[in-house]
Amino acid sequence: KNEYPDLSPYHIIIMASGIYYGNFDKDLLRVADHCLRDGDKVVGLMTYGGQAKFNGRDLDGVCRMKFANLLCMYGCPGFDTYGPFKLVGGMNKGRPNQEDIDGAVAFYDRLVEDYGEIIIEERAKRDKQDAFNAAHPAGGLMSNIKRSAKKIAKKFEKTDDAQ
């Protein structure tokens, strides 16, 4: 439970889950909360038992909190045994099927075809910024306070010299 993957080498991060009681899998959301970074490009894949409504709002919330970009969501019906459906053997038996899987592949191919170059360009900018930040560390909170104090002291020196 405390092992988290390094997602930094990936241009697009795909988070896939079934929908459980209207939400993405809690463990997947925990991993996303721990691993996503500012500027990550995320695509959500989901299977749902009920209607095709936006069930990925919890993944969207995690992405917003981490300043990652949720590009799009793809969903298809999945086998569901929630509540009364359990009594009749479930609904959407045999789903996702090959047609649903082909739809997901076509969805991804369209995404790469339409936005692949843009995503690669943005990733190159991000890699350049990461390299700069690694070469020039900010120094943390105390360093920022010292730098601010020095700037304020210089302003007071200038006003004293002017008088």
Q: Where do the language-model regions lie?
A:
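A short beta-strand-loop structural module common to alpha/beta enzyme folds
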Residues: 1-4
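FMN-binding flavodoxin-like domain, especially the glycine-rich phosphate-binding loop
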Residues: 9-163
